[in-house]
A protein has these predicted regions:
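Non-ligating segments of multi-cofactor redox enzymes
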Residues: 1-581
Length: 581
């Protein structure tokens, strides 16, 4: 079997495996739904994620030790990951092939020549690593913005799968929505479609993981090269070169992605995969200048300060950034989150959303709770998000820890935030309309939302009694809307104290649930008041955990009348609402 055929089989296998892992990241009872599938495996193989988290946290989440195997294999075989394993690289490879397949040899060679701009990816890598390492107290993990595994995972989970599945609902029970999905889609399409202009555009010019492999690759034992200097210069080896490494001359080892197209194309067996250096010479070091390195390093160092200028980790923290249950304290969270979207994908209620720029640049695409989207708020019996987090930015917690029961009873439940009633928009508070939706839907026991009963006289609710017969009161002002007061929350009051529930009404009369007292007072009644019984909601901040179900169910559209913010979250000691005694 030809080596390129083997490589294509590997690419198809790992790409389909990646898609399968995206599909099975679904909570459910079917055999393919989150049943021990290693859906974080591609991230665990990613040395850039491992290096980034080590630099920011000075610890290594043990599943990321898989990345060490990737590094060792790269030191032995070269940049195998880019052309044999990486699903994003395989996608670029395929689209690039479609873009150049009908072109002539000279044009293909021109497309695949090395360009000095390919050094940009090394500068991107240096800038990202500078963000993670200097200074350690302010370090932030931003490699997930451009890391290829993070980019393709985020794009598939938050954009492509929801779009493809929307007509059939095979994967998702209900249609999925993600805020800012358009930006993720635009970046993904731009990265993929640029391959039509230059093959593997993203891999050559942008990919920081490819840059890291390029640095490691210069020490590889096995490498592509010429067995002899003499060559007929047919340049067939550069026709389909995926990395632009110029195998016909002094091959650029750091740019070779080990696609083996050159070896397969060489009709004279001059190109070989060997342990000795190329007979025609090699360029082993990445093509970067000291000035460019220094500039990217300084950019990364200044970037740390620039993204923290708004003091979002201090007193100016953004109250709408409500993290999923089990999230680490904000500073530590931002040192670990790679913005992959796995937690958003697995959330059964679709409440976990990618953050925008409102919480600061480093908050972009990190998980936040948006209780207006999806089918509900954060369900009490769900801890799926922490089980799929690659770097443990969201800790894997148990239901007992989330609910604060059994061995966690003393610590209490995990609070994601606190619900606040906006009395200027709440129906019972602002508009004298009966509503207890938030209290009814609070899932806690005892409930964190309770009500206090009040009777309020309606505007224009004072009427003159014209005639009283049995349980019916005819009024002098005949202007009532039929059945308006028949819902069970309206009462007929006399002297502000005696009340009888209104059971029906016409334009000119009210029917009440009369009792003996009503019949005794009937002859004396001249003025009546129509009152509404209001159950005005209050939040017990010591019980509320910020699940957001009340906010999701609130009937006030637009800006909800009860909203959850991050005050009181248990992960941050400086965001407590009450002093502990």
């Amino acid at each position: 079997m030809r080596i390129v055929t083997t490589r294509r089989i590997s690419q198809v296998f790992f790409f389909l495996l990646f898609v399968w892992f995206c599909i099975v990241a679904t909570v459910g009872s079917k055999f393919w739904q989150l049943r021990g599938w290693p859906i974080e495996w591609f991230f665990q193989l990613d040395p850039l994620v491992a290096v980034g988290t080590v630099l920011t946290t000075h610890t290594l989440y043990w599943p990321l030790l898989w990345a060490l195997a990737t590094v060792v294999l790269t030191l032995i075989f070269g940049r195998f990951f880019c052309s044999w394993v990486c699903p994003f690289g395989s996608l670029h490879h395929f689209v690039g092939f479609l873009g150049r397949r009908s072109k002539k040899l000279a044009h293909k060679v021109k497309l695949n020549r090395y360009r000095k701009a390919q050094r940009v990816k090394y500068y991107v890598l240096v800038a990202f690593l500078a963000l993670t390492a200097f200074p350690s107290a302010a370090a932030t993990l931003q490699v997930g913005i451009l890391d290829p595994i993070a980019v393709i995972t985020r794009s598939f989970n938050l954009v492509l799968l929801p779009i493809v599945d929307s007509p059939t609902s095979f994967i998702f029970i209900s249609r999925r929505f993600y805020e800012g999905g358009w930006l993720i889609l635009v970046i993904f399409l731009a990265a993929v479609l640029l391959n039509l202009a230059i093959p593997r555009f993203y891999c050559r010019f942008i990919c920081p993981l490819g840059a890291l492999f390029g640095i490691i690759d210069r020490f590889a034992i096995w490498r592509i090269g010429k067995k002899q200097r003499e060559c007929v210069n047919c340049i067939l080896c550069e026709r389909d070169c995926e990395g632009g490494c110029e195998p016909a001359g002094n091959i650029r080892i750091s740019e070779c992605v080990l696609c083996f197209n050159c070896l397969d194309s060489c009709k004279h067996s001059v190109i070989a995969y060997q342990t000795k250096t190329s007979a025609a010479g090699e360029v082993t070091n990445p093509d970067i200048s000291r000035r460019g390195f220094a500039l990217s390093l300084v950019s990364g160092l200044f970037g740390v300060g620039a993204i923290r200028l708004s003091n979002r980790l201090g007193s100016n923290w953004y109250y709408k950034v409500v993290r999923p249950p089990g999230s680490l304290p904000e500073e530590e969270f931002l040192k670990r989150c790679v913005k992959c979207g796995q937690c958003m994908r697995v959330c059964p209620t679709n409440v976990i959303q990618p953050a925008g720029f409102e919480g600061g640049l480093e908050n972009l695409w990190t998980p936040v709770l948006n209780n207006r989207i999806g089918s509900s708020g954060c369900q009490l019996n769900c801890v799926a998000c922490g089980q799929v987090c690659t770097t443990s930015a969201i800790r894997p917690i148990t239901l007992a820890e989330k609910l604060g029961v059994n061995e966690f009873a003393e610590a209490g439940p995990i609070k994601m935030g606190t619900a606040f009633v906006d009395r200027s928009r709440c129906l019972p508070w602002a508009m004298d309309k009966p509503c207890i939706v938030c209290e009814e839907n609070c899932p806690l026991s005892p409930k964190a939302i309770f009500t206090r009963e009040e009777f309020v006289t309606l505007r224009d609710g004072v009427f003159t009694a014209k005639k009283i017969g049995g349980d019916t009161i005819e009024i002098l002002e005949g202007s009532l809307k039929p059945a308006k007061f028949a819902g069970g929350d309206y009462y007929c009051a006399v002297d502000g104290s005696a009340r009888w529930k209104i059971t029906a009404n016409t334009e000119t009369s009210l029917t009440v649930s009369a009792d003996e007292r009503f019949r005794k007072l009937a002859a004396e009644i001249s003025k009546i008041e129509v009152q509404v019984r209001l159950q005005r909601p209050y939040v017990d901040i010591e019980r509320c955990i910020g699940c957001g179900i009340c906010e999701h169910e609130c009937p006030v559209s637009g800006k909800k009348a009860i909203r959850v913010s991050a005050e009181g979250e248990t992960r941050s000691a400086d965001r407590k609402l009450l002093l502990e005694r």
